[in-house]
Swiss-Prot record:
GO terms for cellular component: extracellular region. Residues 54-72 have a biased composition (Low complexity). Residues 45-109 are annotated as: Disordered. It comes from Dictyostelium discoideum. This is Putative uncharacterized protein DDB_G0282065. Glycans are attached at N27.
Length: 109
């Protein structure tokens, strides 16, 4: 029984030594040839960040456009810019009419 344990342990040790040697023996000799997944991710992230941040000229152009044309809410159902003033006036007039009707109903009761 002791011999079997010794043989199993020695086989595991030999296996791990061979595994370690094979993993350390890579064909990559130059750092340029080593393109790991982290290098690819870092490169793509850097390209994304460079393309994401606008330069100063683009920011100035956007500010000028925003100053010339104030932002408008686009109605999702119609696709045209909303006129909030008319919408709010319509709501207020409906509320006033409803209040008048409620007051008249209360006076009648």
């Amino acid at each position: 029984m002791k011999n079997y344990n010794f043989i199993l342990i020695s086989l595991f040790i030999i296996f791990f030594i061979i595994l370690n040697i094979s993993s350390n023996n890579n064909n990559f000799t130059n750092a340029e040839e080593m393109t790991g997944i982290n290098d690819i991710i870092n490169r793509r992230y850097q390209e994304y960040m460079e393309n994401r941040t606008p330069n100063e000229q683009q920011q100035q152009q956007q500010q000028q456009q925003n100053n010339n044309n104030p932002p408008q809410h686009i109605d999702p159902l119609v696709g045209n810019p909303c006129n909030h003033d008319q919408i709010m006036q319509g709501r207020i007039s409906k509320l006033k009419e409803k209040l008048k009707k409620d007051q008249q109903n209360q006076q009648q009761n």
